Amino acid sequence: MFSSVKSKVIHVEPVIYDLVLEPFKVHILGCGSALPTLKHSASAQIIEMRGKCFMMDCGEGAQMQFRRTHVHFAKINAIFISHLHGDHCFGLLGLLSTLGMLGRTAKLKVYAPESYGDLFKRQIDFFMQGMEYEIEFVPVDTEKAQVVYEDHSVTVETIPLQHRVPCCGYIFREKPTLPHIRRDMIDYYEIPVSQINNIKNGADWTTKEGDVIPNARLVMPAVSPRSYAYCSDTRFVPGLAEKVKRSEEHTSELQSP
């Protein structure tokens, strides 16, 4: 369903450029309800974007689904938990243990409702003795929309939801990138490499003859950033549709009355 993103081709005269987008994939490892079925595993997803790999919820059976989708355990950069019902988090400790047995050394952050903090620490202290990587618990205020993760290319923002327990969704967003340089214009006007970043950031270019070349002639617009919204179990939330409508894709799990 969300397994791949096609390259977008932008035509600029007189040269044709093919701008290949970085992969943006969502792997649905599980989408079943609280009761197990033979067709669907419990809730778990992997979001691949900008060279990173984020896990969204971790129900039972997630590790087996990793194997089936050929996503490598070692690629996980961070784990996000929407709420503390078992079908969304009972697979977490097993996965963390497996990562340790596979020799992970990189630090891993787990974002989850703040009420899980004390229990999570006790579970890690009891079950994860001797593991050679650090696990950091990051408490999430499920009642507040806020950016909980940010790096140079991606942000993750919470979406307050309404469920029987504290619960939030997450929006994974790409950050805008700089415009793309037109190589034919750079060559034609003999612009030195040292000026490329200035031009990407909006500078015009003045030729040896004193002519000012507008920036718009030297660059192509950047590809629009993409986003993905994950809304787990929730009742009707006024304004929720407005918050996620700008996302290219989204997943929602609705709670029956």
Residue spans for each PLM region:
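Active-site metal-binding motif and surrounding structural segment of the metallo-beta-lactamase
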Residues: 60-111, 139-141
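Short "domain-exit" segments at the C-terminal end of structured domains
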Residues: 253-257
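Conserved beta-strand hairpin/beta-sheet module of binuclear metal-dependent hydrolase folds
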Residues: 12-69, 105-107, 170-172, 221-230
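Active-site metal-binding loops of divalent metal-dependent hydrolases
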Residues: 31-32, 61, 84, 115, ...
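Metal-dependent phosphodiesterase/nuclease catalytic metal-binding core
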Residues: 2, 6-7, 12, 16-20, ...
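Active-site neighborhood of divalent metal-dependent phosphoester bond hydrolases
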Residues: 104-108, 113-141
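Generic structural signal for residues in well-ordered beta-strands
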Residues: 26, 135-137, 156
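Structured loop/turn residues at beta-strand edges in well-structured enzyme cores
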Residues: 71-74, 133, 152-154, 245
